[in-house]
Amino acid sequence: MLKQVLKIGLGISVVASTLLAAPEKTKLKIGFIALTDCAPLVIAKEKGFFKAEGLDVHVAKEGGGWPGIQQKVISGEYDFSHALAGMPIAATLGINGNAHLQALLSLDFNGNAITYGNNIIAEMEKYGLDKTKRPVSAESLKKYIDAKRAKEGDNYAPLNFGMVHPVSTHNYELRYWMSASGIKPDQDCTIKPFPPPTMPSNLIAGNIEGYCVGEPWNSRIVLKGKGSALVTNYDIWNNNPEKVLQARADFVEKYPETTKAVMRAVIKAQMWLDASWENREEAIGYLAKKNYVKAPKNVLRKSMSGTFLYNKGVDSANPMFNVFANNYAAYPFYSHGMWFVTQMYRWGQIDKPVDMKALIEKVYRPDLFAEVAKEVDYKLPPSAWKKDGVDEYNKFLDGKVWDPNKAVDYIFDFKVQNSLVSKEDLAKANNWSVETKQPGYVCHYGPAGCADPKYITK
């Protein structure tokens, strides 16, 4: 078979076949939200990776937040979209939409932070908060809430916080962080969804005390001097899955070659993004444009260039804040998808027992990814099932281990949980086991998004 080599950045090449089947549909619309982790879609467009696959793609900025994205994918207005990892799972279950959607690939690891305003931080500092300590726990927030309850009694007014969508990583991360210190999010707080770009304005207006969101909307408030980022989602769960590329299952079935062409282009973009920090700087220039994220380059640079801004004036080294390809970040692990299902149960979003393995194997497509990966020379992990919390670069804040074979126990082992389904009923629906295999930490594509240059293997 004839081959062509596409140069994607500083010593990295992608090998793609010139004899691949032609896409059935070439004119496409892909929706995205104005966040730095839309970068793979932007780069696939701007660097010509879509075009090289014979695709004419309109990368469309969605103004209606994640609900708008979901509705337009379900209706068919968007052929594919930037999506929260939990969204295709929820839609397939009939939560926040009702359609069989599929997660074709993971767009990135990490990328979020929990940012609080100056007023709530001042109250937390009275109870021992040291916002320069890493990672920051929610212990001081718990003490403040307890004192506030004691003072207000029956008139207790819950604190208001923001996240981007009920089935978002952000919602689960904010709850995970709070509950690890004994806070009961649904009793002690009110957690509301807001479109990501509106988080800073809602905090400044006093509508919320803080929020969990992706970049650049944490750095934006820190640079304004209106708050501080207390913890990143990397601090909560090292190298956690964040966004996916989603599509309707019937679209994937009807247009398999189009789907694979889009996947190839996006994976090439992900590899390009991690190939060098120079590539990241070029990407910042594209993301800053008004038709994409529309944020100043100096704001975007705070997280995309190997640093993160927790507190104004202090850039902290954080090379893994955004990971797009390294450490198998593009691969849609079944075990990652199932973790989101456990959180849906934990927080009372699913009211009936479901076979979690069957569900995830219906939504996540590592099988299709493996086929495409060979065509672009993307390295595959040994299995779609793995444990998290056991290796150096996938630990949880509270030391817990996520083992998909113990998924039911995992849900009910949390001291704070609001499951609507009994452990016994859920266990009956999940009488299965999987073989897990741990991938070694490795950076196949370059230094960007890599813990240390010693892990780079090309």
Q: Can you annotate each of these PLM segments?
A:
Residues 22-186, 190-193, 205-219, 226-239, ...:
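Short, glycine-/small- and polar/acidic-enriched structural segments
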Residues 35, 63-67, 82, 165-169, ...:
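Soluble non-cytosolic domains of exported or imported proteins
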Residues 338-458:
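Conserved C-terminal helix/tail region of periplasmic/extracytoplasmic solute-binding proteins
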Residues 254-370:
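Secondary-structure end/capping motifs
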Residues 12-21:
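Hydrophobic h-region of N-terminal signal peptides that target proteins for export
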Residues 2-11:
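Sec-dependent signal peptide recognition
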Residues 114-115, 244-247, 251-252:
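Short glycine- and hydrophobic/aromatic-rich loop-to-beta-strand nucleating segment
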